[in-house]
Amino acid sequence: MPAMVLLLCLALGPALRSARCESTEEYDYDYLSINKTWVLTPKAQETDATQILNSLLKNYDNKLRPDIGIKPTFIDVDIYVNSIGPVSVIQMEYTIDIFFAQTWYDRRLRFNSTLKALTLNTNMVSRIWIPDTFFRNSKRADSHWITTPNQLLRIWNDGKVLYTLRLTIEAECLLQLQNFPMDTHSCPLVFSSYGYPREEIVYRWRRYSIEVSDQRTWRLYQFDFTGLRNTSEVLRTGAGEYMVMTVSFDLSRRMGYFAIQTYIPCILTVVLSWVSFWIKRDSTPARTSLGITTVLTMTTLSTISRKHLPRVSYITAMDLFVSVCFIFVFAALMEYATLNYLVGNKKPLEHSSRKARLPPAGAQVMPSFTAINININNIMHWPPEIEEDEDDDPGSPCLEGKECERFFCCIEDCQTGMWREGRVRIHISRLDSYSRVFFPTAFLLFNIVYWIAYLYL
């Protein structure tokens, strides 16, 4: 049996080796044929591209624009907005990341070849003429260089040139903050030629609209992006007329942050100051400490609200609201000071009035015992004792002094006639009751007018 297996292997061995050799040779042949096809074609194209570039740049002068002295060079521009933000209110600037593309025709770069276009690296940028475009309102600008310079140069066989690059620009945006924080802004990005006037370079928008990336990746934080506009205009200067291109980005502020940080605390502080109207007027420490605390709180809120703004000379919507809230809080404190002052002065005046109405000392000695009793009774029971809580009684003795005569009429002789005409009777002890109605009503009316004016007008 082993002998038969050995004979079978010897008989089939040459056939297996022959088949393996044939398959190996076929595999090598296919690989070589594919490899030759893959290598030879790019090699021919590379040689052709090198010859084209050498011939184009042989007598090319990159210091001269295309068609110089014949006609102006038309530059078609396009912008792709990669991201916008953040926006700095204090510095009045915003950051934008864009892909900036410029297209023009240069007859000196025409070539005849089977190649439709040549896509070149950044080394060729410095060897041909490119527009001297600059951004007029940029404070700082950076071109991206990682991992290689983010620039593209493409030349078509008809002389068309495309030059794109990625830029991050910190541009100036003059914010008008009168309606802060319900404000809207239009932040421009302005560019033009630095040295060529309109007679030599004319900028045109390649498309009517500008593309933007997904806005969810933008870092606008306090703002919402509402739209953009692209325009062109002619700027007249002493050096000539220049084509100026502008892209305006419309932004509206989100006021949720400021509502939580400023508006709601101010409203609650004003409401808290009204609590003193329900505290007894003889609780001087409680009412005074509450009034001073609310005034200091409003001072702190006013300082914090200005922290997010530049030092502008005009009043903003938030400044107006905080100032009015401060006035309400301060008025609540002054209300108790006025009440305490008037009530404190009323008691000495009443005491002096009672003394003035007492009969002279000699009049008390009367020959009749009954008369003495009458006089004593008069002394004991007239004028009647008036409790402090009954100061608002219309029949209470009249206050003497300028306060009484100026602000209300309480003298019996002037209840009718010229003294009463045009006067309003005000009860001092009811000043807290008046304030409980007046302060909330006035503050509510102010809020209605304020929010309608700034949100809808």
Curated annotation (Swiss-Prot):
It comes from the Eukaryota. GO terms for biological process: chloride transmembrane transport; gamma-aminobutyric acid signaling pathway; inhibitory synapse assembly; negative regulation of chloride transport; synaptic transmission, GABAergic. One of its GO terms (molecular function) is GABA-gated chloride ion channel activity. Residues 22-256 are extracellular. Keywords: Cell membrane, Chloride, Chloride channel, Disulfide bond, Glycoprotein, Ion channel, Ion transport, Membrane, Postsynaptic cell membrane, Signal, Synapse, Transmembrane, Transmembrane helix, Transport. The chain crosses the membrane at residues 257-279, 283-305, 317-339, 434-457. Glycans are attached at residues 35, 112, 230. The keyword Transmembrane helix applies. It is a multi-pass membrane protein. This subunit carries the benzodiazepine binding site. Generally pentameric. There are five types of GABA(A) receptor chains: alpha, beta, gamma, delta, and rho. This is Gamma-aminobutyric acid receptor subunit gamma-4. The gene is GABRG4.
